Amino acid sequence: MSAAWPGGAELPTEPVGSLPRPSVLQRAVLDAEIGQISAAELERAQEAAVRDTLDRFAETGSPLVSDGEQRRQSFSSYPLGTAPHDGGVEAGPVFAVFADGHHRVIPSLARGPFRFRGWAADDVARSRRLTSRPLKQAVISPSMLSLMVPAEGLGDYSRAEFLDDVVAGCAEDIRRCFAAGASRVSIDFTEGRLALREDLRAPWAGPEALGGFIELINRVLAELPNELRAAVGVHTCPGNDNDSAHSADVDYAELIPELFQIEAGYFLVQSASEKDPDSVARLVGRQLRHLARSGERSAPRVLLGVTNPTSPKLETAEEIRDRLVQAARFIPAELLGSTDDCGFSPYLIDEKPRHGSPDFARDVAFAKIAARVRGTELASEELAGRSTGSQSYAGYGATGTAVVLP
């Protein structure tokens, strides 16, 4: 069942999803693939990693905890099940080329129809047995799944039929998460920013793709009752794999206005690793002001990224406090919150080269989460002590000049 947002001046904070897998788990996965260990031994390694993750999350004081996707191969592959090739899935075209030169591919559906063979709710249910704390769960987007089938479809299985199946599956995935005990769910939408990057090495990408992605996500959200939709977020970032991004060079000014056409309950927006984090808050504030003036729908909450998962440099609680207080110049405090820029390791096998090892990266991740939690508390206290007067819906234009709403 979804959790209520904090009241008063308290700013919400939550993780995105993934955390670095311990090196022992990464080795166990590789050993299992070549038959060196049994499925039962792999399950024990996964269970140990999940228990450690939940325990260390609790130590940070985080209001919501997560299993850090310790059981997943990647953020995008879990719907394919544990034996995707048995379900007619094969390696497809390039999904993204990262700044360090490595790439990831899109799974390609060899035959229809498409059906979910694994559910995010399975992870929620397992974690629910291990903790009584509120759980956060990340899920795949319909737009990511849409890349598995070409425009011409697969023989008698048309692309329109495929997209109908994707939408139905994604909506069911979210409903199951809440039924299993998740308090909030967010849709990973890393392909949103990447869609605006024209790259011949990733042939699916291009600005024309973004509109179709947004339509698909809205179709999924429309399948959910209002009380659940309010607890469903959409996360955007420029990617994070092996401490490298895939679309950090894409101007946020191109994405943010389009992003807020998605009718989600809240958004998680990467910001800390931007060259100018204030520009992100300013762009977001302008969109919130537009929504308020148009009366189209209630303005959503926005959780800004205040930690950079690609860097081992630790943010302090005081730095995070200052970032949030500064962001409140542009985003109403009652709609503001914090998160991490991205999942810390969206793919299971991740050497975390800038950190030196996945184990050290794991320690760094929990230290960053603890700083985020404490920094958000400090920002809440400081903002609570300020008088907002009649301008609680502070909107600032691109010039930085305050705009008072009528």
What feature does the model see in each segment?
Residues 1-406:
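Domain-level signal for soluble alpha/beta catalytic cores
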